[in-house]
Amino acid sequence: LTNSYKFVGPSISSRLTQENFDLTAIKEKSPIYISLGTVLNQAIDFYKLCIKAFGNTEHTVVMSIGGQTQLDELGEIPENFIVKTYVPQTELLKYTKLFITHGGMNSTNEALYNGVPLILIPLSADQPIIAEQVTNIGAGISLQMQTLTANQLNEAANQVLNNPSIHKAVANIKESFQKSGGYQKAVDEIFKFKSQYGI
């Protein structure tokens, strides 16, 4: 590649949220985190499937259901589940052991930046391509929403959590992302370019 390109990796920053979420409650529990993002998150059947897959297991599960699903629509919530409308995702991912996600670009980058392996369930747009790339680099696995079962999701979680090669791949990507500089590196390169060419 020529000097015309500067790769600075993803730009990761905290997101503002109105949700009251106590991170101290989960810091020592290394939860599984489940979210379908902020756009196509009206998925009651999927959330119920997650409860069936992980309810009353040894895992602590944090599930973000967005603003289009009401908590009472999900029925009884198991004691090992924390279900919220929204959560501080970038902060939560620092303590997460597995992220089950739709595979949006932001969510995927934020997970890998924090060294979190992925189960991707792509829904639309670029998500199938992102899911394919994540599986190609060994940082997670991809499942299909249309045929997904609770047993399949539980088995996939165990597969990811107990696979050393996935954890190694994720650790390598985390190191690469965190060394790349992000938006601060981009700003530095822009000012360097301006200075170099007297702009």
Question: What is the predicted role of each segment?
Answer:
Residues 1-199:
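Catalytic core of nucleotide-sugar-dependent glycosyltransferases
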